[in-house]
A protein has these predicted regions:
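Short, low-complexity, polybasic intrinsically disordered segments
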Residues: 83-98
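Compact, glycine-rich, soluble single-domain proteins
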Residues: 1-16, 29-41, 46-58
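Short conserved catalytic/interaction loops centered on acidic-Pro-aromatic/His motifs
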Residues: 36, 66-69, 98
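Short, acidic Gly/Pro/Ser/Thr-rich loop/turn segments
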Residues: 27-29, 95
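Glycine/charge-rich, flexible interdomain linkers and switch-proximal surface loops
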Residues: 4-19, 68-81
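Short, glycine- and charge-enriched coil/turn segments that flank and shape catalytic ligand pockets
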Residues: 4-5, 61-66, 96
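Short, conserved loop-to-beta-strand elements that form functional interface hotspots
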Residues: 49-79
């Protein structure tokens, strides 16, 4: 988030913000071939549930005001307003290479 100098230097923790974590099966969709995404490389439910719960535990350890979450695998309707101008994409394969 922007600081007083309009630089992206502040975290949600710095600002006393909360977080909403929603599991999303479409998070891993390979679009390299064809017109439809492939989810073959996405984690299967037992591993995915463990990863989701580990992520929630880590979010709770970060000191945010609060961390709310949905139910893994549930059909949920979520309304949000993105405050852009950008979206951050994290590629765990790239992070692991560092």
């Amino acid at each position: 988030f922007k600081d007083e100098n309009d630089k992206l230097n502040l975290s949600a923790k710095d600002l006393g913000y909360s977080a909403l974590v929603v599991s999303q099966f479409t998070l891993y969709g390979d679009t390299k071939k064809g017109f439809r995404p492939s989810f073959i490389k996405a984690a299967r439910p037992p591993l995915a549930v463990d990863a989701y719960e580990l992520f929630l535990a880590e979010m709770n350890r970060q000191g945010l005001k609060s961390v709310q979450h949905g139910e893994f695998g549930a059909d949920m309707q979520v309304e949000l307003c993105n405050d852009g101008p950008f979206t951050v994409m994290l590629d765990s394969d790239e992070i692991i290479k560092r």
